[in-house]
Amino acid sequence: RRQRQMCIRDSPITNEGAGGEVYHTIYYVAESPHDKDIIYAGADDGLVHITMDGGKNWSNITPDLEEGMINSIDVSPHDPATVYIAFNRYKFDDFKPYVLKSSNYGKTWKVYNNGIEKNSFVRVVREDNVKKGLLYAGTERGIYLSTDGGENWDKWQRNLPIVPITDLKVHQNDLVVATQGRGFWIYDDLTPIHELSEVSKDKNVHMFEV
């Protein structure tokens, strides 16, 4: 049977169908929970696009960073203009964490990584469904928590093993964690975390409700 041939960097190779030879590929798509016509698309080459009309027209809103991968996109459940991106460059031997945030539909971006270990590249970011500005970040070496919209991050490992976090989902006041090689974990009842997000860090003692 005759095999299909394709050319990469001017050298013919056999397309074995595994997909490793494919690049500039859409890697993540996120629909806004506020408007079904607003959709974000991120690619494995770092490009980000947005459509405001259900896919008829797209605009390039790529952050001004070196080439990397858009690993996940999360639209804020509280503000339709706010979106978070987990961006990484580990394939370029850059393991720094990149949590990107835009508050204007991707017109401008800012990196938020204060407190995240320098070699813990980020795979996923989610905002809490109840508390605005309460963020969870899944990294290559565990989970981080931010109570101030990403300005500062704290390690939130608890009894979770040191393992890559591949996805996060807030579901019915629980945080569901998908890991690479260690199964699924669930942080049951986020109520104390919601309460903690309202506590000033200047207070030495806080009594939680029981």
Model-derived regions, located:
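Repeat-solenoid scaffold signature
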Residues: 1, 128-198
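Short, small-residue-biased leader/transition segments that mark boundaries at the very start
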Residues: 3-8
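Conserved blade-ending motifs and adjacent loop-strand segments that build the rim/top face
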Residues: 10-19, 23, 64-71, 113-126, ...
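Conserved beta-strand position repeated across blades of beta-propeller domains
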Residues: 30-32, 74-76, 126-127, 169
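Short coil/turn segments that connect the beta-strands within blades of beta-propeller domains
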Residues: 36-37, 80-81, 132-133, 173
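Recurrent small/Gly-Pro-centered beta-turn motifs in extracellular repeat architectures
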Residues: 43, 86-88, 139, 179-180
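A short loop-to-beta-strand structural motif that recurs across blades of beta-propeller domains
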Residues: 47-50, 57, 97-101, 108, ...
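Short, solvent-exposed loop/turn segments at conserved positions within beta-propeller repeat blades
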Residues: 91-96, 137
